[in-house]
Amino acid sequence: MLSTILNAFQVADIRKKLAFTAGMLLIYRLGSHIPVPGVNLTAVNAIQKSFGGSNILGLLNLFSGGSLSRLALFALGIMPYITSSIILQLLQVAVPSLEKLSKEGEVGQARITQYTRYLTVGLAFAQSIGYVFLFHTLQAKAGESVVTHFDAPHIFLIVICLTTGCVMLMWIGELITQRGIGNGISLLIFASIVSRLPAGIQAWWTTPNQVFKVMMPFLVLAIVAGIVFVQEGQRRIPVQYAKRVIGRRMTEGGQTYLPLRVNMAGVIPVIFAASIMAFPPTVGQLVKTHWGQQVSDFFSPNGWHYVVGESIFIVIFTYFYTAVTFNPVDQADNLKKYGGFIPGVRPGRPTAEFLDRILARLTFPGALFLAAVAALPTILIARTHQNIQLGGTSILIVIGVALETMKQLEAQLMMRSYEGFLK
């Protein structure tokens, strides 16, 4: 890993991509400390503890990189965009016109991306209104109003600023994906979680529970090792290519393999599941009624309802995103088109069924592992009554995004080495 990073800095083009990515992430972190206009900073500082625990506000604050607790420009984080992406991907299965659009190549994907952006703006606007009223209800803890003037013009100004911040984050994420290294949206969440690491380490170090203090580092190391093992694990399907006559020349047949990863979906299912499970308690916090409080308590991040629900969604999204990433029918058609076949399996439909069966067997343990890693640290923190935000979901996202970014960096280096060879 270290050699890959050192080699990357020796290539001018990759060096520019890394610098661009770092610059965009720096802008994100700066925006996370810029308060929106019309906010009483003294009152905001007085309610910081409400966002420091392992409740739903602490979880939302974690994914916003601490911006929510400061009611900063990027307080919404990137969650509205992720929610919009989930909705559009699910609609592609249910709505025939969207399904047809998704199969029209780059033009269709560009249209779907545009719809995702529009939906993001709508969700961000609605969520901004909810957050303004949420902070207004927290004034009892602050002793004074968080919003300096709670009237329509000032509320509208704050809502517009928060919505603009979310749209700006969406734009930064897309820019990183296009001109930088790695997936921009994943890297923004990665930066948010990493920025909260010092607070998590301090909470662990100052805990009076000595058993928890000793166990936590070993648990984290075991989780990291397990994530790397599963993320890098793959089954290699042997592929044989027959001899082919091209013009007057006969090409030699060869043997290679088709790598099927244990966790082909990567860290996306975990991000999607966390986004879905954050929705009910967020609504419960915004609706200041007895029913709303019950919903918020029922889906508390440390409750077993939340853990079970998140685990189920992780398994579902792992299968769903694996199906989006790898299509056995298309893979079988490509093998048949170029004269390839799997020994002992007939080309065409039998090959597709074989790949689908193997992929299902690989995906199931991978999905269960992701769900277990997300749940176990959360259960441990809840049972030991520790006030630490960094649970299994956070560790999964950080390690998963780091591994995927390193793979993209290695792919960029390999591509540049081939270009140098051809020159």
Short names for language-model regions:
Residues 1-102, 107-423:
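N-terminal cationic and glycine-rich segments that engage phosphates or anionic surfaces
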